[in-house]
Design a protein with these regions (language model features):
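N-terminal entrance/gating region of PLP-dependent enzymes' catalytic architecture
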Residues: 1-82
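Conserved beta-loop-alpha segment that forms the PLP phosphate-binding cup at the N-terminus of a helix
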Residues: 67-75, 85-108, 121-125
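PLP-dependent aminotransferase-like
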Residues: 107-154
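Active-site phosphate-binding strand-loop segment of PLP-dependent enzymes
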Residues: 142-186
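Acidic/histidine-rich catalytic neighborhood
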Residues: 144, 193-207
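Active-site C-terminal subdomain of aminotransferase-like
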Residues: 202-254
Length: 254
C-alpha cells in the first residue's frame, strides 16, 4: 500500500478508462437480445440515492421509506401472478434458494425435480438445502418433457419460464402436480404485464412460489429480483428468524 492515498478525484480519473472503457456496453447494437438490458437514466439517479443513504431494510426504523416502497412494489406486482406477497432479493439465485427453502420447511419436500435446461441455481439450491436433485430430459423445443415425469408426491417441481439458452417455457399445465411447485420466471416473468403476451404464462397463478428478475425485462440495475408466494404467511413461517436486536422477523436470506 502507498503511504498516502491518491484522493477521490484522482482515483476516479485513474479508474475511468478501465471502468468505462472496458465494460460491456449493453446499450450497443452488438448487445442486441442480451438478457441483461441497458438501464434507463432514472435508475442511475436512484442508485446514487441508494449509495448515499445506505438504508438497511431489516427494520422500518432503519429504512422507513425503503421498507414501505418495497411493500408497494410487491403489492403492485403480485396480483399479476396470482400471489399474495413476497419480498425483494439480490438476484434470482437468492430468490430460487428462498423458494426451495420454504418448500422444504413448510411442505417437507425431499427432492427437487427440474428440466435439464433449468438454471444452475436450482442445482445449487438443492445442494445447499440437502435435497436430492432430479433432472428431466427436454423435448425438441427445450421444454421439460411431460412424458418423462414420474411421482412427485414428495417433490418440489421447478418449472422454468424462459430458459437461459433458448427462452423456452416449461409446460405450466404441470403446476400443482407436486408437493410444491416453484416457477423460475427470472427471464420471462414480466410477460405477465404484457397486454399481448401474458397468455404465454397461463397457469403460473397456481404455483406456490415464483421468482422474477427485475434486472432483466424490468430494466433495473443488477442485482434485483422478487420472490413471491401464493401463501406468504405459510412460506414466511418456515424462513423467518428474529430476536436480539431485531424487533421484527427477518424473512428469507435478506
Amino acid at each position: 500500500f502507498p503511504d498516502f492515498g491518491r484522493g477521490e478525484d484522482e482515483t476516479l480519473n485513474l479508474l475511468a478508462p478501465y471502468v468505462l472503457g472496458r465494460a460491456t456496453r449493453l446499450d450497443s447494437p452488438i448487445s442486441f437480445a442480451h438478457m441483461d438490458p441497458p438501464t434507463p437514466w432514472i435508475t442511475w439517479a436512484m442508485s446514487l440515492w441508494n449509495a448515499r443513504l445506505n438504508q438497511n431494510l431489516l427494520h422500518s426504523a432503519s429504512a422507513p421509506f425503503a421498507v414501505e416502497a418495497e411493500k408497494k412494489v410487491i403489492d403492485w406486482l403480485t396480483p399479476f401472478y396470482g400471489m399474495d406477497g413476497g419480498h425483494m432479493c439480490s438476484g434470482s439465485t437468492i430468490a430460487n434458494i428462498t423458494a426451495l427453502w420454504a418448500a422444504r420447511e413448510v411442505r417437507g419436500v425431499k427432492k427437487v425435480v427440474a428440466s435439464r435446461s433449468a438454471h444452475f441455481s436450482i442445482a445449487k439450491a438443492a445442494s445447499l438445502l440437502g435435497l436430492s436433485y432430479e433432472q428431466i430430459p427436454t423435448d425438441v423445443r427445450g421444454r421439460l418433457n411431460l412424458n418423462e415425469i414420474e411421482d412427485m408426491s414428495d417433490a418440489c417441481l421447478v418449472l422454468t419460464a424462459g430458459t437461459t439458452d433458448t427462452g423456452a417455457i416449461d409446460p405450466l399445465v404441470l403446476v400443482g402436480q407436486a408437493k410444491w411447485t416453484h416457477v423460475d420466471a427470472a427471464w420471462a416473468g414480466p410477460l405477465r404485464l404484457s397486454l399481448t403476451h401474458a397468455y404465454l404464462l397461463d397457469g403460473i397463478t397456481g404455483a406456490d412460489s415464483i421468482a422474477v428478475s427485475a434486472h432483466k425485462w424490468l430494466f433495473q440495475p443488477k442485482d434485483s429480483s422478487l420472490i413471491m408466494f401464493r401463501d406468504t404467511e405459510l412460506a414466511n413461517s418456515g424462513i423467518s428468524f428474529g430476536g436480539s436486536y431485531l424487533a421484527a422477523p427477518n424473512v428469507g436470506l435478506q
